[in-house]
Amino acid sequence: MAIETGFNQSAAETAVNQIISGGADVRLMTTSLDYDDTATELDTKEVSSTDYTTVNVPDADWDISVDVANGELTLTNNALVDFGETQNDWGTVVDVAIHNDGTDDFIRADEVNDPEITTGELVRFPAGEITYTLGP
């Protein structure tokens, strides 16, 4: 029996492309996402400040790379994702969702630093900062 499980390259590319095709919304979460969450749960776990809005990233602004030797696929933003300057406190961001708007499909990227976002901060992800790796 195999030690490693998961998608093969073709299936991984198909799954990720389904989410980013046509553009994907980057959403900041103040409550941890769960494996079985749907778009409804995303709405309740997202930053709730009145000056916050999701950022749609066109599919051309995402890069997919494959490391065949290690069986990994990596999705990375190749352009600035800019939420702008906060006018209110947004709370502590614990997860980032890359969401196919209008569906229940999303990629959960753990925000390992759990930043507390307060009034007057510029919230930006430079190219290469949002990275999701699918594989062992």
Question: Which residue ranges define each predicted feature?
Answer:
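Small cysteine-rich, disulfide-bonded extracellular modules of the LU/uPAR three-finger superfamily
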Residues: M1-V96, N100-P136
